[in-house]
Amino acid sequence: AAISLPLGYTTGKEYAELEWPIDILIALVWISYAIVFFGTIGTRKVKHIYVANWFFCAFILAVALLHIVNSAEMPVGFMKSYSAYAGVQDAMVQWWYGHNAVGFFLTAGFLGIMYYFVPKQAERPVYSYSLSIVHFWALIFTYMWAGPHHLHYTALPDWAQTLGMTFSIMLWMPSWGGMINGIMTLSGAWNKLRDDP
C-alpha cells in the first residue's frame, strides 16, 4: 500500500483502495490469523471462553467477511480491476464495508482489549457478565445494519436509508452498556488509573 497507492494503483473506493493482488494477500493474512485464533480457542483447557474473546472473535470474523465481500473484483490487469458490483449496490456494499470495517476493526477490537485488561488491572471480575452478553449481542446485531446512514439522500431506497439511520440511533444502547460495564468494573479501584501504568 505504501508503494502502490502513491504510484496511482487504486480501486478508487474509500477505505478499500488497494488493488486485487494486495486484497488477496490481506485476505490470506487475515484468514491465517483466524486459523491461529480459533485453533487456540479450540485447544483451550478451560471450558469457559472469556468475554474479551467474544469481541475478538467478532472482530476477526466481521473484518474477514467485510474485506472479502467488498473486495470482490474482476481483474483486467496486474494492478487494475473493476468492482463486482455497480451503481447503488456498489455504494451499499462499499458503505456496509466502510462503516463496519471501522466499527469492527476499532470498536470490537478495543472492547476486547477493555474486557481483558480492565478486570485484570482492577483485580476484580467484570461488573456484570449478563450486561456483557447483552452488550456483545446488541453491538453485533445493530452495528452491521448501520452502514446505510452514509448514503442518506442518495439513490439508495428510502427503506434502506431509514433502516441504517434507525440502527445507528440504536447503537447508543450497546455503547452505554460497554461503558457502564467498564466503569463499574473499575468502581472501587479508581486508584489503579493513577498508580498502575
Residue ranges, per PLM feature:
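Juxtamembrane membrane-water interface segments of multi-pass membrane proteins
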Residues: 6-17, 36-54, 72-94, 107-134, ...
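Membrane-interface loop-to-helix entry segments
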Residues: 22-28, 48-62
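Catalytic-domain carbohydrate-binding cleft regions of carbohydrate-active enzymes
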Residues: 21-24, 129-145, 155, 159-162, ...
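Alpha-helical transmembrane segments of polytopic membrane proteins
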Residues: 19-29, 95-108, 162-174
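Helical transmembrane-bundle signal
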Residues: 1-4, 26-36, 60-70, 112, ...
